[in-house]
């Protein structure tokens, strides 16, 4: 966590995994467009994977809006808001809003990772944000039924 999430949480950085994921998206979209030009590529992520997916997809929009059209839905669970990191990556507010139209976040108010960098109203954050509440109102660090795990919902 320290080497990945903490770096993002403290500095709103463009994380190394997202840079690699962006390269993979570019490559896979090129192949997909050649083999199935009408197909869409859906992206999902949980926890650190939300930061990776969100930054990679947003960077794709920034670099190549035409390739971004191949992205279908981006569905993310229990992840931090990446808005400031996208600004730090050189994206404009207009680009962030446009890229966010395909992104849906499901966040949990009892989960530490879900609430990272969520300091503005949800409508001002990247993507569409839906709040979900765990069945037992558990927190992130509880060993049984952690609110950060999928099975708790």
Regions found by a protein language model. Name each.
Residues 69-153:
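The feature captures the conserved acid-bearing segment of alpha/beta-hydrolase catalytic domains
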Residues 44-49, 53:
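Gly/Ala-rich beta-loop-alpha elbow adjacent to hydrolase catalytic centers
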Residues 1-44, 64, 68-73, 84, ...:
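A conserved cap/lid and substrate-binding interface adjacent to the catalytic center
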Residues 60-63, 92:
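Hydrophobic alpha-helical segments
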Residues 55-59:
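Active-site signature of alpha/beta-hydrolase-fold catalytic machinery across serine-
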């Amino acid at each position: 966590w320290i080497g990945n999430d903490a770096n993002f949480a403290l500095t709103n950085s463009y994380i190394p995994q997202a840079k690699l994921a962006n390269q993979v998206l570019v490559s896979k979209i090129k192949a997909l467009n050649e083999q199935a030009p009408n197909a869409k590529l859906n992206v999902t992520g949980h926890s650190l994977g939300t930061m990776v997916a969100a930054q990679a997809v947003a960077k794709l929009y920034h670099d190549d809006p035409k390739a971004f059209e191949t992205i279908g839905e981006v569905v993310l669970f229990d992840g931090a808001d990446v808005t400031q990191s996208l600004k730090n990556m050189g994206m404009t507010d207009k680009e962030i809003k446009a890229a966010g139209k395909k992104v849906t976040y499901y966040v949990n108010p009892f989960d530490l990772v879900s609430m990272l960098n969520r300091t503005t109203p949800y409508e001002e954050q990247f993507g569409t944000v839906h709040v979900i509440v765990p069945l037992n109102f558990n927190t992130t660090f509880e060993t049984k039924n952690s609110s950060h795990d999928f099975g708790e919902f």
